């Protein structure tokens, strides 16, 4: 293992001892904020240090086995121990490197999910509704809560655009690689000749800002309009101006919210989505810069990139970034995304490990 990594691990081991001591200090336990911070740090450090101590023990066992190689009576046993120990050491080194990878500070956060119909007219809107159902079912599987913030439906029950807040620990870490272009190939319900059509939708996954204060929203930069909320086909569902449209003048970002009968609640939701979008723009700019430097496809933040194709006649889904094809489209559309999300996370980790090895 690289000396710089060993130095870092030794420092983390010392820090764990220090944190353990502080958690037993009555003065610290009286300060709940400090106690919570230290408890979280202790939980983060413990698995790293445990693996490090296991690595050190394996290194010591290997040294003992090497000493026995000169003993004719023990040579065969020593060689077997060396072989096993070296395999164990390689596994421990890989696990330690993964544990040392930089943590995404947004991983534990709730998210705002946006699905927009692209090319394909009504069929694209129907596919947007299918995608939204897919993510909603995935959220249910993880016992997360889904709250629709804003939805624009067409007459066939599809979504021109739908924005939802998904509340659940680690939601961003599991869904952050879903942003991008999603393409569908199938025979639309409106097609009478049985021809396969290709349509597309765009998905955006944004971490919820901790607080609105985390993103500076200068009131002078905002234009807030109110209007009557309307349902599919333009029918009014509310006779008061409860719907809210917020425009962020410096960026041109526009957020509409009309799902609640309360103008106050709609405004609060719209501002929360706006804060997430502004934060997302800043984050994607950083990601694209980093991705250009390391020629990464995963987590590049490029929303124009076509990331996945759903082919209904063949029952397959293909993620183009990692060349993964699954012939279980029905299960995927029902929210069984674990195989996809796990593979994308593993690929991202591999990219980070390669970067770590090159540093």
UniProtKB/Swiss-Prot annotation:
<protein>
    <recommendedName>
        <fullName>Peptide chain release factor 1</fullName>
    </recommendedName>
</protein>
<dbReference type="GO" id="GO:0016149">
    <property type="term" value="F:translation release factor activity, codon specific"/>
</dbReference>
<keyword id="KW-0488">Methylation</keyword>
<keyword id="KW-0648">Protein biosynthesis</keyword>
<dbReference type="InterPro" id="IPR050057">
    <property type="entry name" value="Prokaryotic/Mito_RF"/>
</dbReference>
<dbReference type="Pfam" id="PF00472">
    <property type="entry name" value="RF-1"/>
</dbReference>
<comment type="similarity">
    <text>Belongs to the prokaryotic/mitochondrial release factor family.</text>
</comment>
<comment type="function">
    <text>Peptide chain release factor 1 directs the termination of translation in response to the peptide chain termination codons UAG and UAA.</text>
</comment>
<feature type="modified residue" description="N5-methylglutamine">
    <location>
        <position position="235"/>
    </location>
</feature>
<keyword id="KW-0963">Cytoplasm</keyword>
<dbReference type="Pfam" id="PF03462">
    <property type="entry name" value="PCRF"/>
</dbReference>
<dbReference type="InterPro" id="IPR005139">
    <property type="entry name" value="PCRF"/>
</dbReference>
<dbReference type="GO" id="GO:0005737">
    <property type="term" value="C:cytoplasm"/>
</dbReference>
<dbReference type="InterPro" id="IPR004373">
    <property type="entry name" value="RF-1"/>
</dbReference>
<dbReference type="InterPro" id="IPR045853">
    <property type="entry name" value="Pep_chain_release_fac_I_sf"/>
</dbReference>
<dbReference type="InterPro" id="IPR000352">
    <property type="entry name" value="Pep_chain_release_fac_I"/>
</dbReference>
